[in-house]
């Protein structure tokens, strides 16, 4: 599903080089629930950018669903990204749009038909327990509820992979566990879930609770 083969990424600066990743090898199987754990500056953001082809590795290969991203043509990048749903730490909801409109908008910009949008948005919101709040604006929701909208938005187009970038960074510990339980439920329907975080304590709590988690340090 996701493979990093001897991947290094170096950023050139004016007078120096910044090594973000060095000789990283990672294998994530289809249907896995994986935590990528690392401190600030460990290269977690670079890992995400490489998967989404926002960056290319300096050395090595990145493969997603068998596609070698180092050889993927630029015109095929949108198709790659449609296989993924991304959940951000800061939610990135549009404040003037309702819950329904936020999820629908993300589908509309990828040219999904109106018919599919009308079917998929309520379904995605029901999966995260927000079907009764479709007409609310983001500022009428709690932080945990806003993150659930972000998860629904990531799910709505039917991705094979969910990638969550520090998804508990802006919510309290109790809500963090709720969000993780939601990811576990998503994973049970054979969606690969990759959570990138620096929160060691949360990860170890979850590892004690669920026996299907995989942990990768970078």
Where on the chain are the PLM-derived regions?
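Helix-to-loop junction immediately C-terminal to a conserved catalytic motif
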Residues: 52
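Conserved ABC ATPase signature
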Residues: 137-141, 145-147
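A short, proline-enriched helix->beta-strand linker immediately N-terminal to the Walker B motif
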Residues: 156-160
């Amino acid at each position: 599903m996701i493979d990093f083969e001897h991947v290094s990424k170096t950023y050139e600066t004016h007078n120096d080089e910044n090594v973000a990743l060095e000789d990283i090898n990672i294998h994530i199987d289809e249907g896995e629930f994986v935590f990528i754990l690392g401190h600030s500056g460990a290269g977690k953001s670079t890992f995400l950018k490489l998967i989404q082809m926002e960056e290319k590795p300096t050395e090595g290969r990145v493969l997603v669903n068998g596609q070698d991203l180092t050889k993927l043509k630029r015109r095929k990048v949108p198709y790659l990204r449609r296989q993924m749903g991304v959940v951000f730490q800061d939610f990135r909801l549009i404040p003037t749009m309702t819950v329904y409109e936020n999820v629908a908008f993300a589908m509309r910009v990828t040219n999904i038909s109106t018919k599919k949008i009308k079917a998929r948005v309520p379904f995605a919101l029901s999966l995260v327990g927000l079907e009764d709040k479709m007409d609310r604006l983001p500022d009428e929701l709690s932080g945990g509820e806003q993150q659930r909208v972000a998860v629904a938005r990531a799910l709505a187009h039917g991705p094979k992979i969910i990638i969550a970038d520090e998804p508990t960074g802006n919510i309290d510990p109790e809500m963090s566990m709720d969000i993780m339980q939601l990811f576990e439920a998503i994973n049970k329907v054979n969606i690969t879930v990759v959570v990138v975080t620096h929160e060691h304590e949360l990860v170890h709590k979850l590892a004690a609770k669920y026996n299907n988690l995989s942990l990768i340090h970078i």
